[in-house]
Structures are given as structure tokens and as C-alpha cells.
Amino acid sequence: MQHVKELSAKLKEKKGFALKMLIGLDGFVDEIIHPVDKRQDYKTFTRIKTIGEFGERITKAAGLSTNIEMVTIQTKLGGNGPILSNALLEYGVKLTYVGALGTPDIHPVFHPMTEKAAAVYSLCNPGLTDAYEFEDGKLIMGKHSSLSSLTWEVCKKGMGGAEGIAKMVGECHLFGMENWTMLPHMSDIWQGIIDEVFPLLPATAEKPLAFFDLADPEKRTKEDIRRAMGLIGKFEQKFRTILGLNEKEVYEIAEVLGITISDSSTDKLKDTVVAVHKAMGIYCLMVHPVRTVCCAIGDEYFFTEGPYCAKPKLTTGAGDNLNAGFCLGLALNLDPLSAITLGACTSGYYVRNAKSPTFDQAIAFAEDWDAGKV
């Protein structure tokens, strides 16, 4: 694909960039888990390969009982904000993180990230996540009670009041408050920023970027989702606002917004993305299905195939890595097609290597992708 070939050259021109970003607001300790199908000995087992097989195992136990062994493969930092930030830090962004990393001490799992960050404000304890990984997807089992203490008042107290928050936000090229679904007070926090921080922000020649990721809103009510969409739209007053969704989420948001796409549509995804983008009135809507990436900006729609990986080493965090690459691309003033392609490269590298790429590694991955080596 020509745009993949062109991406590596464009990235080489951007080497040595200097960008500041402020990201929050969640934090999770993730355990990556493989459910056991058959165990051969105390060291060796075969995993349950698909979600369907896992579901069958559970269904067969109805009215009876069963025992499924779970093997922890890795314990790692989790949450949309930390994984997004970790990827941006690998790229060389000067980043401040605000969120649920542990109090009074930051949990050790976050230390590799916080040691690279320009500044860190930890406001409460992290949530806990068990991520059951399969070859065709993952099941996320979350424990979120600690996140209920993260309120607008707590944010102000921990960050120097509205004035302190305004100073941090005003210095950034990109600002993001992620994981609305799992943070029960996030809408109130956004409202607080709109009411108390917006009046303090300096005027700029070009509005900075603001990135939002809902993180699977299905578990929230339609009224909550509509309120969140309205608040995200208001950020357009001071920012070029980006909403990132997966394919499932964009159809859910369309339903909540009362958008209906004709059954005769030849490209339901494109029509849905364009309609939701228009309804929200924001700068950009970006959507990442499993094998592709697309976005709507202005009156244009952009699409690319991705470097699909049939047997990934790690999938939890792939979407956040894609978001990181896309946000970096826009912050570097790449064209939208190049930005979604950088997102695909970032995610593609991550699922193959179980870690986020450096800037040079992303360039090399784009070259390998263009050469058919991935």
C-alpha cells in the first residue's frame, strides 16, 4: 500500500520532535491469564483457545459445577491511560500522568512508566483486572471499587486547584482523560473542567488536541452515555476533540444517538462513522476494528487495512497502542491517513512483541509491512 511506503519517510522527517501531553485518569494492575484446557504436568498445559470453547465449558456446568484453572502469564500495568501513556513515552513524548496509580505509594507495576514521565500525580489506588486471553479475543474481569474515590474535588486537591490544572493543560499539545466507563465520576470531572478550567485556558493560534476513549460503554445507561457524548462535544470549544472507539462501540454510540443506517448500506462501518462524527460535531472520530482502522475528519473519511496478526503474543492494550500512534501522528501534523497508519503500526508491533515500539522501531515496522515481512 502506497501510504504505508510513504509513512516511514514522513516519520523520518519528524525525528527529534518535542511534544508535551497530559494523560489520565485511570490505573489498573492487570493479570494476563490463560485458562487451562488440559494439563500435561506441573509445567506444561494446553490453553482454551477460543472464547467459544470457554463459553461451552461454562455452559456445560449449568446445574452442576466445574473447575477451570487460570494461569497468570504476566502481571503488568493496565488501564487505558497508563497503557496509552506508556506507548507515548516509548515514542519520546514529554508526558505528565494523572490518575489511579496508588496512594500513598505508587504501585510497583507502574514504576517503569512513572520513571520516564515528566511528572506524576497519583490520586487514588488502582483498580484490578483479570484479562482472560484467547486466540480470538479477550474477556476482561474488572474490580473497580477503588476508583469510586476519584472525584473532581480530589483532582483539584491533588493538582493545585483549577488554576494548576489549567496551567498543565495549557502547556500541552494533547490532553486526554481516558476510561469513562470504569470511572463513575468521570462525567462530573469533565463538567468541572468545562466550568472551572476552560475560563482559565489561554487563547492559542491553533487549538490543542483532546483525546477521549470511553472503554466499552455497554455497561452504562443510555442516559449516562448521552451525557458523556454531550460533554465530549463541549470540549470542542477549546480543543480539536478526538473520540476513539472500537467497532462494537461505534455501533452502540450510534444507537444511543438515534442514528439508523440502512440495511442496504454497502459500507455500514463507513456510514456509521460518518454519521456519528457529524452528530457529535467534533474534530475527529477514529474507529479501530480488529483488522482495519478508519477515521472521519471534517468532511472526509480515511481508511486503511491493518497488519493483522493471527497469533498475537499479547492483545490486552492493543487498542491503547493504536490510539497512541494515532494521537502522535495527529500531534506531529501528519495527514489523517498517515496518522491511522501509524496507529496500525504501533498496535501491529505491540501484539507481535508484547511491548510498545520506539520511534525507530515503528519506522522499521512500517518498512517491513510495506515489504510484506509482517
Model-identified regions with their sequence ranges:
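A structural signal for well-ordered alpha-helical segments within the folded catalytic domains
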Residues: 79-82, 86, 248, 324, ...
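Glycine/serine-rich anion-binding loops at beta->alpha junctions
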Residues: 74-87, 313-321
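Alpha-helix C-terminal capping segments
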Residues: 85-94, 328-333
